Amino acid sequence: MSVPKTMFQLSGRGYAAANLSHATLVIIDAQKEYLSGPLALSGMDAAVQNIKQLVTAARNAGRPIVHVRHLGIPGGLLDPQGPRGRFIEGLAPLGDEPVVEKRLPNAFAGTDLHERLQQLGHLDLIICGFMTHSSVSTTVRAAKDYGYRCTLVDAACATRDLPYQHELIPARDLHRM
């Protein structure tokens, strides 16, 4: 039996994974909310360590990093004024690294992310963060609409189990999709 091909492979329009020397690192929602509590994600320890490695490599290479932060409801999940809405230790922006604040899963919707990326002048994006099934995948798909070439670092992403029709879809299955 043959292995199915992706749409990119079938169309001949695929591209190689981004090289950090020509890319912008985009970190999505690296916030404390996902470490514990009702939105705790599976595989966070490994994902956080892998994001830290990406951040270190980008900073050492002088590459741009854009941080995306989800603004929840005051007193609720991802509370922008509360501790759970803050960046995870070691993943907070330094110096002039920009922060794009969003209220929807798509980091381009209602934000200046596209303009900031245009100013940086790179079409190649290396994307990581949380949650794989929501903000990460939605942002990657939207980036394609703007003409960006995205490399998703799956080992630097995490998600959670989700309910579906009285069953559970495990995080590991969602993450693979």
Where are these regions (language model features)?
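Active-site-adjacent betaalpha module
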Residues: M1-T24, K52-T56, L78-M177
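Short beta-strand segments at enzyme active-site cores
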Residues: I28, R63-H70, V153
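Catalytic metal-binding/acid-base residues of hydrolase active sites
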Residues: Q31, L71-G72, P105, M131
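Short acidic, Gly/Ser-rich segments with clustered Asp/Glu that frequently serve as metal-coordination loops
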Residues: K32-S36
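A short alpha/beta connector and helix-capping loop motif
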Residues: L39-H67
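Class I S-adenosyl-L-methionine
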Residues: G75
